[in-house]
């Protein structure tokens, strides 16, 4: 069975988004968000790179504009949720220490 190039492109981008999320999760676990402003730079860099990758896939018609927007929005949402969860956990830990 032959898989369409569009499907391969979409699956590749989904996989890359999952890798970015996993990378950021590891970095969040290793860094204290409230004491490490560099984490926002890391997030911005990863999202910028992924956005450029998605833009390229759209230009060569591996994915539609709608699919590209959905991929970027999903990754941004997951990263924001992860960041918020870790930040809240760290804030609660700070309260309990004081």
Curated annotation (Swiss-Prot):
Name of the protein in question: UPF0358 protein LCA_1078
Family statement drawn from the similarity comment of this UniProt entry: Belongs to the UPF0358 family.
Domain of life the protein comes from: Bacteria
InterPro entries to which the protein is assigned, alphabetical: UPF0358 (IPR009983), UPF0358_sf (IPR036270)
Source organism of this protein record: Latilactobacillus sakei subsp. sakei (strain 23K)
